[in-house]
């Protein structure tokens, strides 16, 4: 799922409903961005599992994610780094891989940071099922 168009969402919802009607599990391949997890949840699409290399690819191309925010292309656009740092502070994101400006120079740190952002997004979506107020707060970020 590289692009979540309305048609993609309708198709995924229909596939999920059909799979569940037969007692099957529902896996989605290729979640490209952690924000997609929230969008899927908002559409009533809750896969049993998913996979992604988006965190790896984005980091390799100089982009970093925050759990529920846009991606930032920090290696080529100085303003994007500033926006990322502001969004990071606003969202209280803190991981050992993005503590300083080395993130702009180290592909491995970006990749690992993006993996943490995906894991945090999954946790927010999972907590949202148990704590709707937390989920709604996360959606408003």
Model-flagged regions — what are they?
Residues 1, 28-33:
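Glycine-rich beta-strand-to-loop/alpha-helix junction loops that act as flexible
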Residues 16-26, 34-37, 42-141:
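Alpha/beta catalytic cores of nucleotide-metabolism and tRNA/nucleoside-modifying enzymes
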Residues 1-22:
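Conserved alpha/beta-domain cores
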């Amino acid at each position: 799922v590289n692009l979540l168009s309305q048609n993609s969402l309708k198709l995924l919802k229909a596939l999920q409903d059909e799979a569940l009607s037969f007692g099957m599990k529902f896996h989605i391949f290729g979640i490209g961005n952690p924000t997609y997890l929230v969008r899927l949840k908002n559409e009533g699409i809750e896969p049993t599992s998913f996979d992604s290399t988006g965190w790896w690819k984005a980091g390799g191309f100089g982009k970093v994610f925050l759990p529920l925010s846009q991606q930032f292309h920090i290696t080529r656009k100085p303003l994007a780094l500033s926006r990322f740092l502001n969004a990071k502070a606003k969202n209280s994101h803190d991981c050992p891989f993005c503590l300083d400006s080395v993130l702009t120079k180290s592909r491995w740190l970006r990749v690992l940071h993006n993996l943490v952002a995906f894991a945090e997004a999954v946790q927010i979506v999972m907590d949202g099922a148990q704590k709707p107020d937390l989920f709604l707060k996360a959606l408003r970020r």
